[in-house]
Amino acid sequence: MDGSSDNLIAVGRISGTHGIRGQLRLHSYSGNLESLQAAKNVLIRFPAGGTRQIQLKKAAYHSGKFLLTLEGFDTIEKAQELAGAELLLQREQLPPPDADEYYWHDLLGLSVVTNEGQALGIIKDILETGANDVYLVRDDATKREYLIPAIASVISSVNIHTGTMTITPLEGLLDL
């Protein structure tokens, strides 16, 4: 598995255990179970630092939760060691995103400007709100933050190659 950070995509966070046989609950960032099921190996990034490649034995959806079974983690005690860790896949293990869809990994760090050319800052985080994602944009120089809804009427264009997102802000969006 290529360990370069540009090739690795965080697809979820291990939120805890399920049962006593080492199954893990996964908070998926994408909701895409097929990519996980197709993966043979995953990379685990521990909260305290460091990574470890582990064979994925099974990925399933059960009672509204993603469940994983990893090689070598067959007891609840062993599985608890992974709580809070991020699950990473190689970009090649993921399907290409649809038109006008992007992996979070590709959006984080983009410069955000208005359609009138006003620089707002950098996408620092992406918040899941239920109806749509919200981009947390921060101008490090002024410490100002903006919450930009990820909706078609606001996001005018995204150019991953130039590292820029252009928005048409809703009235009052930038006044808060």
Curated annotation (Swiss-Prot):
- Record carries keyword Transcription regulation: no
Q: PRC barrel domain location, by residue? A: 99-173
Bilayer-spanning residue ranges? none
* Cellular compartment(s): Cytoplasm
By its UniProt entry, which Gene3D superfamilies does this protein fall under?
Answer: PRC-barrel domain (2.30.30.240), RimM (2.40.30.60)
Gene Ontology molecular functions: ribosome binding
Q: Which InterPro entries match?
A: PRC_barrel-like_sf, PRC_RimM, RimM, RimM_N, RimM_N_sf, Transl_B-barrel_sf
Major place of localization? cytoplasm
A GO CC annotation given for this chain: ribosome
Entry's NCBIfam families?
16S_RimM (TIGR02273)
Family listed: Belongs to the RimM family.
Free-text function comment from the UniProt entry: An accessory protein needed during the final step in the assembly of 30S ribosomal subunit, possibly for assembly of the head region. Essential for efficient processing of 16S rRNA. May be needed both before and after RbfA during the maturation of 16S rRNA. It has affinity for free ribosomal 30S subunits but not for 70S ribosomes.
Share what the entry says about its subunit structure, partners included.
Binds ribosomal protein uS19.
- Domain text: The PRC barrel domain binds ribosomal protein uS19.
Protein name (Swiss-Prot/TrEMBL): Ribosome maturation factor RimM
| Protein encoded by which gene | rimM
